[in-house]
């Protein structure tokens, strides 16, 4: 019953018109009125921001803010795979040979997440990593490793929240929400960077358009808090064993080690 009521409320409020109005407001000068309150409520670290709080003209500018030079260091170890975002580590684990994985008591299909069987088959037996971004986090997305971009594509339409309630009651938000996917070949192994849209504001702006990418390079940004799912091919990485659910991560922090072929 709770799941049914939750989904009904989301469907009634999560239409294109509602999303359009909220997006237009966030991009308007009127939204600047609530910036101080927003920064206070979500405890945004203003010392790291590239500009002073009063210099942001809209909520959108604050959401997509850059940081001061040197505030995020990319792990220098050649074999290190790094966090692509500032966020809260949710989980990591094996992708079953059936091309599924379980998180928070819900089973997710890689076929659904990536749109077809051919793409999903590459990751059977591999590893997944999930990182959640709250509205307070820095919203820019960086590459976790170096390699060659093999494909970019978008899937999905409406988006359920990706908070605790959304993960519990939503329609498999990680594989059904609007999502923007970048696949990267790194030394003969494939990784998928799945950027999952949040409720109301689906916008994910791609910044990286070249064929090659360097570890730590900026790739995209969310316009609001959301989630990143990383999928790694079998035998590609070994996740850092000390990672724990709820742990804060920063861009450039080591989350896994590349395994040698």
Swiss-Prot record:
Post-translational modification: Is synthesized initially as an inactive proenzyme. Formation of the active enzyme involves a self-maturation process in which the active site pyruvoyl group is generated from an internal serine residue via an autocatalytic post-translational modification. Two non-identical subunits are generated from the proenzyme in this reaction, and the pyruvate is formed at the N-terminus of the alpha chain, which is derived from the carboxyl end of the proenzyme.
Keyword Lipid biosynthesis: yes
GO MF: phosphatidylserine decarboxylase activity
Keywords attached to this entry: Cell membrane, Decarboxylase, Lipid biosynthesis, Lipid metabolism, Lyase, Membrane, Phospholipid biosynthesis, Phospholipid metabolism, Pyruvate, Zymogen
Pathway the protein contributes to: Phospholipid metabolism; phosphatidylethanolamine biosynthesis; phosphatidylethanolamine from CDP-diacylglycerol: step 2/2
Annotated EC: 4.1.1.65
Localization, UniProt: Cell membrane
Subcellular location, principal: membrane
This protein's GO CC annotations: plasma membrane
Broad enzyme group: lyase
Details of cofactor binding: Binds 1 pyruvoyl group covalently per subunit.
Assembly notes: Heterodimer of a large membrane-associated beta subunit and a small pyruvoyl-containing alpha subunit.
Membership in a protein family: Belongs to the phosphatidylserine decarboxylase family. PSD-B subfamily. Prokaryotic type I sub-subfamily.
Role summary: Catalyzes the formation of phosphatidylethanolamine (PtdEtn) from phosphatidylserine (PtdSer).
Name under which the protein is recorded: Phosphatidylserine decarboxylase proenzyme
């Amino acid at each position: 019953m709770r799941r049914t009521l939750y989904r009904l409320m989301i469907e009634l409020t999560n239409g294109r018109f509602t999303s359009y109005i909220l997006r237009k407001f966030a991009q308007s000068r009127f939204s600047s009125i609530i910036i101080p309150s927003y920064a206070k409520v979500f405890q945004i670290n203003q010392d790291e921001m590239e500009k002073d709080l009063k210099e942001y003209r809209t909520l959108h500018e604050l959401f997509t803010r850059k940081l001061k030079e040197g505030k995020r260091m990319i792990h220098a170890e050649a074999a290190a795979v790094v966090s692509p975002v500032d966020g809260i580590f949710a989980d990591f684990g094996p992708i079953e040979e059936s091309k599924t994985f379980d998180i928070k008591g819900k089973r997710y299909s890689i076929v659904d997440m990536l749109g077809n069987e051919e793409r999903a088959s590459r990751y059977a037996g591999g590893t997944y990593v999930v990182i959640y971004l709250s509205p307070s986090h820095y919203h820019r997305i960086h590459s976790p490793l170096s390699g060659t971009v093999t494909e970019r594509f978008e899937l999905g339409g409406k988006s359920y929240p990706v908070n605790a309630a959304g993960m519990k009651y939503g329609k498999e938000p990680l594989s059904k929400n609007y999502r923007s996917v970048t696949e990267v070949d790194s030394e003969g192994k494939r990784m998928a960077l799945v950027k999952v849209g949040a409720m109301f504001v689906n916008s994910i702006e791609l910044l990286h358009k070249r064929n090659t990418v360097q570890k730590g390079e900026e790739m995209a940004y969310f316009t609001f808090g959301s989630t990143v799912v990383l999928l790694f091919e079998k035998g590609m990485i070994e996740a850092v064993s000390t990672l724990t659910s709820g742990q804060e991560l920063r861009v450039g922090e080591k989350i896994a080690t590349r395994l040698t072929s």
